[in-house]
């Protein structure tokens, strides 16, 4: 029998009590700098490992109750200013008809990756996200109710190039050479696949907003293997298309606009372009200097990031000092503190707490000046 929670409707949500994250995303006044972490619902938490023990990863992703619980776990420990729904970027290729398995110690694996352009015929041409990915929407709606207005809930997706790379490589890759071979050898087929992915992603993000997501993040995790020319041809146009189309559809649906974040990891060369792409927030990794990022984006967007996650292996004192420098570099306006990548499984939860505390404390000092 289905849990009654599965039938909870995306309306009458509890009132939001802490909207600091949403205000910072829009560049509005704040009392403290908001902070959250990519992969804050993750294996570094003993309770997360306990909840996940012995369960198939994607089976967990398909359980709204499990996703809700995992999303809420970090909020019980730390005063984060936002939650991000527990899910995975690879649910999109699954919805398009590809099989993905999570192999312990190896990560996500596609038993039958796309090898040549004719393999595109294996993908569904029409994807009904509301039937294929309804479990994500249900998880978002359930979590919005269970979070009781404590903080906003972020929905997310992988970006087209990042998903294309997984679908061709068959998993993670150091060089992405199989996927990049397509860009150089089969540019037309590459654009066809990227367009197909974009269409599904737009509907998927709209569905997340309808379900209750209060912000959206688009993860372009594999920007670093592209040069500036390839980025401008195979990544940027699709990132822009997603933001514009999602915003148009939100408007058409009579829903309130939600802030959108684009995170193109290692895409320094694209910073100016990304700041003119209809996203309210640009996420940064730790290889960019905060002050130069401010200059290069010219106040057009809010910024999110960008502490090296490995700084969390240091002492609480060093974490506090690194956070102070980071905040002084970014300034307090239009800024969301985060890491420049996700939390790693072997990190000490105590140090994650120290990071959050340092952001809140230092930002209150800065705002008094």
Curated annotation (Swiss-Prot):
Biological process, per Gene Ontology: heme biosynthetic process; porphyrin-containing compound catabolic process; porphyrin-containing compound metabolic process; protoporphyrinogen IX biosynthetic process
EC number assigned by the record: 4.1.1.37
Pathway entry: Porphyrin-containing compound metabolism; protoporphyrin-IX biosynthesis; coproporphyrinogen-III from 5-aminolevulinate: step 4/4
Substrates-to-products reaction catalysed: uroporphyrinogen III + 4 H(+) = coproporphyrinogen III + 4 CO2; uroporphyrinogen I + 4 H(+) = coproporphyrinogen I + 4 CO2
Cited CDD domains: URO-D (cd00717)
InterPro entries per UniProt: UROD/MetE-like_sf, Uroporphyrinogen_deCO2ase_HemE, Uroporphyrinogen_deCOase
Cellular component GO terms, alphabetical: cytosol
Site features described as Transition state stabilizer, chain residue numbers: 88
Major location category of this protein: cytoplasm
Locations listed in the record: Cytoplasm, Cytosol
Keyword terms: Cytoplasm, Decarboxylase, Heme biosynthesis, Lyase, Porphyrin biosynthesis
Class of this enzyme: lyase
Gene Ontology terms for molecular function: uroporphyrinogen decarboxylase activity
Residues binding coproporphyrinogen III: 39, 41, 43, 88, 166, 221, 341
Family: Belongs to the uroporphyrinogen decarboxylase family.
Subunit structure: Homodimer.
Function comment: Catalyzes the sequential decarboxylation of the four acetate side chains of uroporphyrinogen to form coproporphyrinogen and participates in the fifth step in the heme biosynthetic pathway. Isomer I or isomer III of uroporphyrinogen may serve as substrate, but only coproporphyrinogen III can ultimately be converted to heme. In vitro also decarboxylates pentacarboxylate porphyrinogen I.
Name of the featured protein: Uroporphyrinogen decarboxylase
Lineage: Eukaryota, Metazoa, Chordata, Craniata, Vertebrata
């Amino acid at each position: 029998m289905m849990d009654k929670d599965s039938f909870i409707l995306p309306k009458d949500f509890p009132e939001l009590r802490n909207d600091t994250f949403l205000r910072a995303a829009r560049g509005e006044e704040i009392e403290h700098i908001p902070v959250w972490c990519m992969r804050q619902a993750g294996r570094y938490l003993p309770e997360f490992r306990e909840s996940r023990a012995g369960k198939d990863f994607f089976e967990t992703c398909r359980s709204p109750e499990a996703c809700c619980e995992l999303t809420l776990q970090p909020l019980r420990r730390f005063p984060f200013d936002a939650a991000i729904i527990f899910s995975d970027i690879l649910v999109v290729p699954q919805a398009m008809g590809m099989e993905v398995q999570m192999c312990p110690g190896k990560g996500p694996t596609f038993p039958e990756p796309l090898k040549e352009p004719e393999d595109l015929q294996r993908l569904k041409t029409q994807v009904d996200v509301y039937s294929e990915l309804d479990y994500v929407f249900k998880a978002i709606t359930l979590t919005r109710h269970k979070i009781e207005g404590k903080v906003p809930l972020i929905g997310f997706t992988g970006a087209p190039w990042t998903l294309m790379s997984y679908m061709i490589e068959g998993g993670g890759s150091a060089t992405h050479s199989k996927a990049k071979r397509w860009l150089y050898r089969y540019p037309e087929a590459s654009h066809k696949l990227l367009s197909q992915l974009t269409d599904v992603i737009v509907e998927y993000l709209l569905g997340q907003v309808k379900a209750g997501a209060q912000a959206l993040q688009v993860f372009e995790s594999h920007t670093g293997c592209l040069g500036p020319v390839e980025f401008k041809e195979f990544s940027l146009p699709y990132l822009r298309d997603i933001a514009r189309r999602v915003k148009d559809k939100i408007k058409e649906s009579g829903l309130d606009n939600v802030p959108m974040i684009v995170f193109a990891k290692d895409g320094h060369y694209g910073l100016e372009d990304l700041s003119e792409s209809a996203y309210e927030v640009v996420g940064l990794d730790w290889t960019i200097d905060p002050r130069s990022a401010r200059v290069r984006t010219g106040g057009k967007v809010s910024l999110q990031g960008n502490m090296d996650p490995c700084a969390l292996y240091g002492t609480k004192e060093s974490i506090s000092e690194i956070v102070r420098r980071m905040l002084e570099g970014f300034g307090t306006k239009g800024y969301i503190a985060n890491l420049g990548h996700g939390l790693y499984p072997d990190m000490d939860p105590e140090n994650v707490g120290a990071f959050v505390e340092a952001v809140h404390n230092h930002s209150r000092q800065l705002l008094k000046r």
